[in-house]
């Protein structure tokens, strides 16, 4: 776990607890997306470098997001600003999504394949994983041309490497004793 993930964990946990308490998980997801989108904008990054006071930085975020930012979100923005933590917003968001998945009894699966898979193939993989893990499955799919052939499936800390490259490596290892 990276330092950013370690720092992001309590922020995400606190946000998620507020979201559960107020039944506002989707709203908080949108708020986090909004904040991280603004913070990652190239023109806005200059403000995040410390050239502006935390008070005014918070005010800018709050003013831009008047329509979606409630009192709890204002407090989060102020806290992120005071602690100069806008750089870990992606980590906070990812952790929040994982907490939501756990809460809803969903596993998040990262699927990488050498070539583009059709939607029906991805759905078949999803069904197999749901039967295997006995949970709903959300697949995050990416094409990775670095994979020789086949696919790599990552669930939590478990990796199923079904690539040709891995099979060749295993064969090579077994022949070399």
Swiss-Prot record:
Q: Name one Pfam family in it.
A: OSCP
Q: How does it sit in the membrane?
A: Peripheral membrane protein
GO cellular component terms? plasma membrane; proton-transporting ATP synthase complex
| Record localization | Cell membrane
Checking SUPFAM superfamilies in the record gives: N-terminal domain of the delta subunit of the F1F0-ATP synthase (SSF47928)
Q: Its domain of life?
A: Bacteria
Q: Keyword annotations for this protein? A: ATP synthesis, Cell membrane, CF(1), Hydrogen ion transport, Ion transport, Membrane, Transport
Q: Under the GO molecular function aspect, what terms does this record hold?
A: proton-transporting ATP synthase activity, rotational mechanism
- Main location as per UniProt: membrane
Q: Which InterPro entries did the record assign? A: ATP_synth_OSCP/delta_N_sf (IPR026015), ATPase_OSCP/dsu (IPR000711)
Annotated HAMAP family: ATP_synth_delta_bact
The entry's function note states: F(1)F(0) ATP synthase produces ATP from ADP in the presence of a proton or sodium gradient. F-type ATPases consist of two structural domains, F(1) containing the extramembraneous catalytic core and F(0) containing the membrane proton channel, linked together by a central stalk and a peripheral stalk. During catalysis, ATP synthesis in the catalytic domain of F(1) is coupled via a rotary mechanism of the central stalk subunits to proton translocation.
Q: Which family does it belong to?
A: Belongs to the ATPase delta chain family.
Q: How does it assemble?
A: F-type ATPases have 2 components, F(1) - the catalytic core - and F(0) - the membrane proton channel. F(1) has five subunits: alpha(3), beta(3), gamma(1), delta(1), epsilon(1). F(0) has three main subunits: a(1), b(2) and c(10-14). The alpha and beta chains form an alternating ring which encloses part of the gamma chain. F(1) is attached to F(0) by a central stalk formed by the gamma and epsilon chains, while a peripheral stalk is formed by the delta and b chains.
Q: Which PANTHER family match?
A: ATP SYNTHASE DELTA CHAIN (PTHR11910)
Q: What is this protein called?
A: ATP synthase subunit delta
Q: Which organism is it from?
A: Buchnera aphidicola subsp. Acyrthosiphon pisum (strain Tuc7)
